[in-house]
Amino acid sequence: MIDFIDYIQLSFSDATRWNRDNSYTALTDTANALLDFSIPERLRVHLSSLSTPQFATTYTLGTVGLIDGSISYLFSTLPLQTTQSRSTLIPLRKLVPGYRQIHPPLAPESWDSDGPGHEGSDGQEDETTPWKRRRETLLHAILHLPPPTTLNGLFLRRLSPTTQLSVAVCSTQAKPLSKSTPQASILTQLSHDTGKYSAEFLFSTDNALLGFKGLYNFGPDPRDRTNAQRPQRASQSVSLLSAGGEMYYSPLSSVVGLSTGLRFTTLPAASETLHSPSSSAYPAPSPISTFPYTLTLTLTPLTGSLSTTYSLLASPNLAFSSRFGFNVYSWESEMVAGCELWRQKRKPYPYVSGEKDDLAWAKRKMGLLPPLPAPPTPAKRMDLTAGAGESVESDSVIKLRVDQSLNIRLLWEGRVKDLLVSAGVGLGPTSLSTGGAAYGWTGVGVSVLYST
């Protein structure tokens, strides 16, 4: 379960319409959410609040063996009026990362009709145009306690409909008896997203590290006006193939990093085609699969690492994922499998009379009350994606992960009254003090979140 502040940051990205999926950093997000989830450490309590639509705070306290905590503040120039902040109302799927359905990339110019460069009557750029108002800023700071304290800061600003600037700062307090200056580093990231491709330029003061990330989407260019004018059925795609890479270089330490990857994923149209009426003028394309799935392939040439993942959404409440890694230099391999199962809490059908009546079933049988509406048909159930559907809401989720060494992680996350609870256990081989090996507990933890 992500932190409350991270949830607010994601809401800020959604409100400013920044596509975080169109990035090389998010190439394997689906597999990572299903396979690399972490269990809580010890007992942690989070108290959060979105006191105003523009200001949020979080207080965290950890105990059992070691007492630590943190204080977080967040400010946004964009009022998050529609963001749910109460722990009883926040959709659980927005807090628990899982299978992520990728949508077709959109051109930023299609957000509004004016777009960048719109001029007013005096020939100057109009400050009230919609794209000007989207130059929003987010400020975030978190202080980790106890000493040595660590301060993390984030400055995020939309420079244009296609560009975003992010500056992250990390500073650690020096030891009490040390006269050295506190360790600090700054990471600057400039992101550019056109829908067809995305590019990220990075610079870190830590060893003067320079980096570049890029992602290219094969298929029609969403910036092409002719594609937008075609009928929706003809231009609708059922899959998306993306290729990208990243490169790092530090002139001080002579460190070089390089990786490349591919991602093939089905789009929502792949499962909707079966239930959409066909048109004689524009026949419906054949779906690749009735189940949404995502395939990724990543390669790190310098270290010889090769990794493939396959994630499948078998139903709106069940997802599977697997990963196989291999190193061509050391011949070492890795195999991980995981799944998640959601429990849906169905809302009761509304009473026609407007009041709860224990004898409504008898009155309805006698014809005194109109019959209840029919439940959804199987075809409509197939159209439901994760978290979609008006008659169901997520109540809890169970995640399971196991690798070839029998390291097992089991995580349960759900809603208990007004609290959001996350509890997990870890099992695996452990080393004994006598030099032998045994199989036992590797971690147990519970995390509780309450927000207003």
UniProtKB/Swiss-Prot annotation:
Show the segment(s) annotated as Disordered.
105-130
Q: Where are the transmembrane segments?
A: none
Query: Which key words are in the record?
Result: Membrane, Mitochondrion, Mitochondrion outer membrane, Transmembrane, Transmembrane beta strand
- Record's Gene Ontology CC terms? ERMES complex; SAM complex
Domain of life, per lineage: Eukaryota
Family matches, as Pfam families: MDM10 (PF12519)
Please verify whether the record's keywords include Cell inner membrane. Answer: no
Name its cellular compartments. Mitochondrion outer membrane
Major place of localization?
Answer: mitochondrion
InterPro entries assigned to the protein according to its UniProt record, in alphabetical order: Mdm10 (IPR027539)
Bilayer topology term: Multi-pass membrane protein
GO terms of biological process kind: establishment of mitochondrion localization; mitochondrial genome maintenance; mitochondrial outer membrane translocase complex assembly; mitochondrion-endoplasmic reticulum membrane tethering; phospholipid transport; protein insertion into mitochondrial outer membrane
| Domain remarks | Lacks alpha-helical transmembrane segments, suggesting that it resides in the membrane via beta-sheet conformations similar to those predicted for other outer membrane proteins and porin.
- UniProt-listed HAMAP family: Mdm10
What's this protein's function? Component of the ERMES/MDM complex, which serves as a molecular tether to connect the endoplasmic reticulum and mitochondria. Components of this complex are involved in the control of mitochondrial shape and protein biogenesis and may function in phospholipid exchange. MDM10 is involved in the late assembly steps of the general translocase of the mitochondrial outer membrane (TOM complex). Functions in the TOM40-specific route of the assembly of outer membrane beta-barrel proteins, including the association of TOM40 with the receptor TOM22 and small TOM proteins.
The record's family statement is: Belongs to the MDM10 family.
Summary of subunit composition and partner proteins:
Component of the ER-mitochondria encounter structure (ERMES) or MDM complex, composed of MMM1, MDM10, MDM12 and MDM34. Associates with the mitochondrial outer membrane sorting assembly machinery SAM(core) complex.
* Name this polypeptide is given: Mitochondrial distribution and morphology protein 10
